[in-house]
From Swiss-Prot:
It is an enzyme of class 2 (transferase). Ca(2+) 1 binds at residues 202, 204. It catalyses: RNA(n) + ATP = RNA(n)-3'-adenine ribonucleotide + diphosphate. Its EC number is 2.7.7.19. Belongs to the poxviridae poly(A) polymerase catalytic subunit family. This is Poly(A) polymerase catalytic subunit. It comes from Camelpox virus (strain CMS). SUPFAM superfamilies: Poly(A) polymerase catalytic subunit-like (SSF160957). Polymerase that creates the 3'-poly(A) tail of mRNA's. Induction: Expressed in the early phase of the viral replicative cycle. Heterodimer of a large (catalytic) subunit and a small (regulatory) subunit. Ca(2+) 2 binds at residues 202, 204, 253. Pfam families: Pox_polyA_pol, Pox_polyA_pol_C, Pox_polyA_pol_N. The lineage of its organism: Viruses, Varidnaviria, Bamfordvirae, Nucleocytoviricota, Pokkesviricetes. CDD domains: polyA_pol_Pox.
Amino acid sequence: MNRNPDHNTLPNITLKIIETYLGRLPSVNEYYMLKLQTRNIQKITVFNKDIFVSLVKKNKKRFFSDVDTSASEIKDRILSYFSKQTQTYNIGKLFTIIELQSVLVTTYTDILGVLTIKAPNVISSKISYNVTSMEELARDMLNSMNVAVIDKAKVMGRHNVSSLVKNVNKLMEEYLRRHNKSCICYGSYSLYLINPNIRYGDIDILQTNSRTFLIDLAFLIKFITGNNIILSKIPYLRNYMVIKDENDNHIIDSFNIRQDTMNVVPKIFIDNIYIVDPTFQLLNMIKMFSQIDRLEDLSKDPEKFNARMATMLEYVRYTHGIVFDGKRNNMPMKCIIDENNRIVTVTTKDYFSFKKCLAYLDENVLSSDILDLNADTSCDFESVTNSVYLIHDNIMYTYFSNTILLSDKGKVHEISARGLCAHILLYQMLTSGEYKQCLSDLLNSMMNRDKIPIYSHTERDKKPGRHGFINIEKDIIVF
């Protein structure tokens, strides 16, 4: 039986486009499955591969100069990938190839190719901070929280780091400057821009086009190194993707957020790069200390945390005029846990217009209760807070994604109480609400504290879902 389509019954232009792309006459099945992809296929077919090769070579020279590969090898890898469809007969794989090639031909130049042209002048905007003056205070605060007991029998997952991280970091520094409306950074690198004594590994980023950027970067690395690069999506980390090499070594990761979320994230401008406001980052750190795993990290490397904490404390002292005199007033706010229903009630009336906050430890339960309230004014800040917030009838409803530490049976540990207070303050900052007095009291409540042992802790909310991935070598997309 003839598997080829009848030339007399098919639109000649569409058939010709598909035939040119595949390098062969398509089967009937291939034709009917691919004809809706004609526009993308056309873009791929007319794409100037020579210019693309030149851009990749320039990226290699600027950011990957120490990688031992020749210009001819790069060209061969690129041309091989753009002709891969001619040797592929599986429809699913053909769709994957078309999708990934389409991303490259429509976005690479604007996203990564632009990094090879002359950059705008860097606007120096650094302020001299006296971080040293905060080191002793930070050490005292962290010492009182260094209460985790490490279980030596616990098997920790290894986080293998690729040797390419330093190259990608160099690229990311330029990327953050060129794309500072759609990509901002946080974490150690952002604090390094304030305090050069901070050590950092990879660069932590939030952006509005994460998937496209990571696909383009994955191909750049593949074409330069020849390695198989895999993009993975983790179900319990919202809108998160990571690039790893074929040996499962971590290269870079990214959280994707909507543009409207990006617009409200507090940020500051340093050397043409936007970083998440260190005040906001400090609140996030205080919140994360409620997570038992983070306290275990603190016990393993307290000096790393001390450098970060001191930097952020100095920033808030300088920026907001915070006085560290130990006056904490009503901080941390009173917290009562309902362990059966997994809800913590925080008394907020001393600081805010809403009288209390109900912090749910199960996101699905919160979503259900919000529906029952028939309220449609909730704020979802995605991975920025990993939470939804709703204020209804003078009550805040929110999701708290970390563990709750207990200092005794039924008693919330002060570390978690401060974490919950910080979580509420994140909302205040994101919505331009009042937070400075509360921030001052919260930070002062961390001074001169004795260590309080952890009695127990709640479990984190279990997130459903499966891992997704893009395997470039095997032409597979699973999401």
